[in-house]
Amino acid sequence: MNKFLVFFIIFVINTCYANNFSAEYKVSTTGIKIGNFSWSLNINDNIYQTEINLKNSGIFSPLYKFEGSYLSTGVIENNIFKTQNYKQFWKTKKKTKIVKMSFDDYLIELKQEPIEEEIARVDLEDLYLYFDPITSFINILNGEN
């Protein structure tokens, strides 16, 4: 009976509010594999972390190398995923791009390496409840605007 109670407390109660999802895909164009795509979403007590990873693979790997990772963490309030931190890394033969963003209900901080030369068409600091691309996609899939 004690073993059952310990098992129940550790494995059942502890994970009642946890959800982990992951998926892996092969990326192809006209039937030719060019890369791998993986996506994970972990939810625990209204806190989430989602990560996407991309990497070249297949016959064209020597010609077009790329890799990227996207990490978003935040909270879930009223069934809406709200970003707190976002990191993006993208690397090709020609360049490496790193983006870091922090949020409350507004964008608090945006860092880009190298610094973006192009002038922004939208003032991101004025957007209310603006989220990173991954979290926005999750909210759409979740039926939220």
Which residue stretches match the model-derived regions?
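N-terminal cleavable signal peptides for secretion/export
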Residues: 16-80, 85-98
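Sec-dependent N-terminal signal peptides
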Residues: 4-14
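Solvent-exposed helix/loop surface patches that form functional interfaces
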Residues: 96-145
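Alpha-helical structural elements
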Residues: 6, 20, 81, 85, ...
